[in-house]
Design a protein with these regions (language model features):
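Sec-dependent N-terminal signal peptides
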Residues: 5-14
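Long, Lys/Arg- and hydrophobic-enriched amphipathic alpha-helices
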Residues: 307-357
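N-terminal secretory signal peptides that target proteins for export/translocation
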Residues: 1-2
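Generic marker of residues within folded, mature protein domains
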Residues: 9, 209-211, 344-346
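Active-site histidine-anchored catalytic micro-motif
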Residues: 22-299, 303, 307, 312, ...
Length: 357
């Protein structure tokens, strides 16, 4: 949903930022990762306060569960379209340190693939204050660099998916710290390798800090679900079933089939591979089969969670599912916000929110 705005922004900043080593970054004064999208997402405290009031007025019930999420899958689209799905899910992320696993929408333009992508910023901008980068970032990266991970501030700088989550994480915890990672194109086998390696790195770091999963650290992955229709998708026809009422209903049925078969219940390698079979072309993993933008981030996050779980499987619950044309559009124009794309029966996006524990 961000293609028009973010693509133009990407072209402007591409020449201004380059990959830098962790050592060089430490020698310089801390750099703040600036914002990509100030239209679809809130970036000021009063915007967030107003939005949360409006979400509650739509019937959202606050989640005070005693058992926090260890891993979640959250959308990253315009707040007016997603409504309360963000706080419904993220309020129950209680950890002080959050490993963010996001989409790398612009990776192909930079010819980046096959590696987890870290960054070297000193902090990220948040509505109330800058969001600190956890010291765990350097520790995790040190264990992964070369074979499984690389640095690219250029790619991280133009990516919007993780940015969408920060205002809500900071709303519920003003002192939250983050480790931002984005996932470009990679084969299903490579996703498994990277997820397993990330789990091993996390296990070492968690042991060093004496952290408890869910209490001290959590994994927050992001994807929007299907990007559907044949209108204003850059010339692409993504309406597999057509975009009349019958076609859209068939698309929703497939969405729930994917969620039920792959994402709900215990995390297993078989379910993760099945998710890839739904979303990736069998002959070329670079090509969409069903247009979930997190077709790489979700498997990596689930493999990481699977291999990190030492006692039993994590089990996933569907907290909510909606789309940009079925959910009430929360008013945002008076908040100096808006929308980055249209929402019509021939151009809509699905939103799946799942929590694991």
């Amino acid at each position: 949903m961000k293609y028009k705005i973010v693509t133009a922004f990407f072209l402007v900043v591409l020449g201004l930022y380059s990959c830098k080593s962790v050592n060089k970054n430490q020698a310089a004064s801390p750099r703040i990762r600036p914002l990509v999208d100030t239209v679809g997402f809130a970036h000021l405290p009063w915007q967030m306060d107003a939005l949360m009031t409006r979400f509650r007025e739509t019937g959202w019930k606050e989640n005070h569960a005693a058992n926090p999420w260890k891993t979640v899958i959250c959308p990253h689209d315009d707040y007016t379209y997603t409504g309360a799905i963000y706080p419904e899910l993220l309020e129950n992320v209680k950890a002080a340190t959050v490993l963010l696993i996001g989409v790398a929408h612009k990776a192909a333009q930079l010819k980046i693939e096959d590696s987890l992508v870290f960054e070297t910023y000193g902090a990220w901008k948040g509505p109330w204050k800058n969001v600190r980068i956890s010291a765990a970032r350097e520790e995790i990266y040190r264990l992964l660099k070369g074979k499984y991970a690389m640095l690219s501030d250029t790619l991280q700088r133009v990516e919007h998916s993780l940015e969408a989550l920060i205002p809500f994480l900071q709303y519920f915890n003003r002192n939250v710290e983050i480790v931002p990672v984005i996932v470009p194109a990679m084969s299903p086998e490579r996703m498994k390798e990277c997820g397993k390696a990330l789990a091993e790195a996390l296990r070492n770091v968690v042991a060093d800090h004496n952290w408890t999963w869910g209490k001290d650290f959590a994994i927050v992955a992001t994807t929007d679900a299907v990007h559907y229709g044949n209108e204003d998708w850059g010339g692409s026809d993504r309406a597999r079933f057509g975009c009349d009422s019958e076609g859209n209903e068939k698309a929703l049925m497939l969405e729930h089939e994917i969620i039920d078969n792959c994402l709900k219940g215990d995390i297993t390698p078989e379910k993760i591979r099945l998710f890839s079979s739904y979303t990736l072309d069998k002959d070329d993993y670079h090509v969409y089969k069903w247009t979930w933008c997190g077709r790489y981030s979700v498997p990596v996050a689930l493999y990481t969670s699977y291999f990190l779980a030492t006692q039993g499987h994590l089990s996933g619950e569907l907290v909510d599912y909606s789309t940009s044309i079925t959910r009430f559009h929360v008013p945002v124009d008076d908040l100096r916000m808006g929308r980055t794309a249209i929402a019509t029966p021939c151009h809509w996006v699905g939103y799946a929110a799942l929590g694991y524990r």
